From Swiss-Prot:
Disruption phenotype: Still forms preautophagosomal structures (PAS) in proximity to the vacuolar membrane. The gene is ATG18. The lineage of its organism: Eukaryota, Fungi, Dikarya, Ascomycota, Saccharomycotina. It comes from Kluyveromyces marxianus (strain DMKU3-1042 / BCC 29191 / NBRC 104275). It is a peripheral membrane protein. This is Autophagy-related protein 18. Belongs to the WD repeat PROPPIN family. The 377 first amino acids might form a beta-propeller domain involved in specific binding to phosphatidylinositol 3,5-bisphosphate (PIP2), leading to the association of the protein to the membrane. Association to the membrane can also occur through binding to phosphatidylinositol 3-monophosphate (PI3P). It is found in: Preautophagosomal structure membrane; Vacuole membrane; Endosome membrane. Its main location: membrane. A motif (L/FRRG motif) lies at residues 289-293. Residues 289-292 are annotated as: Necessary for proper localization to vacuole membrane. One of its GO terms (biological process) is autophagy.
């Protein structure tokens, strides 16, 4: 096991049909169905290996073991011809690369370079704030050609001290307090960057343009200022202009993802308890989901191709799958919805005990959550017997009582308050099969529905409980593939009607020869 290479990068291609993996020895490309490796290069450590759908074009960035594999150098490769198409060197380390059929975006710590992928001509440069996590998502659809990335921190003036509560706030007597309408009390402060301004400059070289996102380096100079860094910028890759800023969360963005058609944006904050989905066209919040009670690190978000499901991978080795059937939030008033949508993160209890986090994430759907997410189905959710524990049964009973109480109280409160009490839970979940106790990173891809012959898996399916199905040989299931940072690909199946626990069908190693 000690001879196995170290994994530096792992990802699906844009439609989830292939896998690219970068290691300390080189990189590999795999086909998902049927599973198998079809390309390998062992010329040096790779930190980024991005595919363009199922084509022979690869974007590769090295780990710096030699000058040719510098982490500042982007190499565009043709795997069929085994040749280098072009190389581009950047001033700092490349953190992320995203591609579709018309655009290529290269993310550095404080810049994003946008290229025409057909000729690698530089079209635009975006100056943004520090993005050490390399967060960026590009729509695979060239018609809704969008790029999203975290907005620079927004500074909000506040005279409320940290940890202040309604029990110990004292109103300070001052001239401004006695006369709150004094002109200088609301006067414009040029040093206030609560509304970042964008500037566009034109240069004569290849018509390149630079957009500044309003980076503010003095956000911590005033201790009475509140820093809000949960906004997301939506950038149109066709017009090369930002279209809007979506106020996604109060805390720092931990993960974001555009849907395959570029119409939806999913976001998660560093707390990892609330997942939100926005309409990219108007910025309205159309879905809000509760992943769990305890804080955890969200490693990735993934939409299904038809936007019916959203997979959320966390460091607790659990993947939650939410159903996006009917909109749970009325988006007829987008401004009102987004004005205080951070309330949920503040009012929900937050914990940081990583040991308990894993137990909470293992919860199954209770009756109320099942009726919400699968209102058109009277069948019980699937329960994986291998995940049945006494603790899980106790948590399920406790959650049922809590949900009933929230439902009763919600009837007496406005919609916004009741949505905080009873946010939508996951439709299905799976637990990554691993023996390590260390947190892992994972990414999921939800495939198109397939017809599964349950007779081929007698140990996984109890056909005696499937009297509703006249033909058990053609059970409709949805494959869910999960990549782990340990170097495994797992293939689970999801029942699109019943939800519940996803069943593990296959498991492959991406490192073994």
């Amino acid at each position: 096991m000690s001879d196995l290479p170290i994994i530096n990068f792992i990802n699906f291609n844009q439609n989830g049909t292939c896998i690219s993996i970068g290691t300390s020895q080189g990189f590999k490309i795999f086909n998902c169905e049927p599973f198998g490796r079809f390309y390998q290069d062992d010329e040096g450590g790779c930190g980024i290996v991005e595919m363009l759908f199922s084509t022979s074009l690869l974007a590769v960035v090295g780990m710096g073991e030699n000058p040719a594999m510098s982490p500042r150098r982007l190499r565009m490769l043709n795997t069929k011809r085994h040749s280098v198409i072009c190389e581009v060197t950047f001033p700092t380390t490349i953190l992320s690369i995203k591609m579709n059929k018309t655009r290529l975006a290269v993310l550095l710590q404080e810049q994003i370079y946008i290229y025409d992928i057909s000729n690698m001509r530089l079209l635009h440069t975006i100056e943004t704030s520090m993005n050490a996590q390399g967060l960026m998502s590009m729509s695979p659809n060239s018609e809704n050609n969008y790029l999203v990335y975290p907005s620079p921190p927004k500074v909000i003036n506040s005279e409320i001290k940290d940890h202040a509560t309604t029990n110990n706030i004292n109103i300070k007597k001052s001239d401004a307090a006695e006369d709150p309408l004094r002109k200088d009390h609301f006067a414009y402060d040029p040093s206030d960057h609560s509304h970042p301004q964008s500037t566009t400059e034109s240069t004569s070289n290849n018509h390149n343009r630079t957009y500044s996102s309003g980076n503010n380096n003095n956000t911590n100079s005033n201790p009475n200022k509140i820093i809000k860094n949960g906004d997301v910028i939506v950038f149109n890759l066709q017009t090369l202009q930002p279209t809007m800023v979506i106020e996604a969360h109060k805390g720092e963005i931990a993960a974001l993802k555009l849907s395959a058609d570029g119409t939806l944006l999913a976001t998660a904050s560093e707390k990892g308890t609330i997942i939100r989905v926005f309409n990219v066209e108007n910025g309205s919040k159309v879905y809000q989901f509760r992943r769990g009670t305890y804080s955890t690190k969200i490693s990735s978000l993934s939409f299904s191709k038809d936007n019916q499901f959203l997979a959320v991978c966390s460091s607790s080795k659990t993947v939650h799958i939410f159903k996006l059937g009917e909109k749970i939030i009325d988006n007829t008033k987008p401004n009102e919805l987004n004005s205080d949508d951070d309330m949920d993160d503040d009012l929900l209890p937050q914990f940081e005990n990583g040991d308990d986090e894993e137990e909470v994430d293992e919860e199954t759907l209770d009756e109320e959550a099942t009726s919400l997410n699968s209102s058109h189905s009277n069948k019980e959710p699937i329960v994986d017997s291998s995940r049945s524990t006494v603790g899980r049964m106790i948590r399920k009973s406790s959650q049922r009582l809590s949900r009933k109480a929230a439902k009763t109280l919600g009837a007496y409160f406005p919609i916004k308050v009741s949505s905080i009490l009873e946010p939508s839970r996951h439709f299905a979940s799976l637990k990554i099969s691993t023996t390590t106790n260390q947190p892992i990173k994972a990414i999921a891809a939800i495939d198109d529905p397939i017809s599964l012959n349950t007779n081929e898996y007698p140990d996984l399916f109890d056909t005696s409980n499937q009297a509703d199905h006249q033909n058990t040989d053609g059970l409709k299931m949805i494959p869910v593939r999960v990549l782990s940072s340990e170097g495994y690909m797992y293939k689970y199946i999801l029942d699109p009607e019943r939800g519940g626990d996803c069943i593990l069908l296959e498991q492959y190693s991406l490192l073994s020869e």
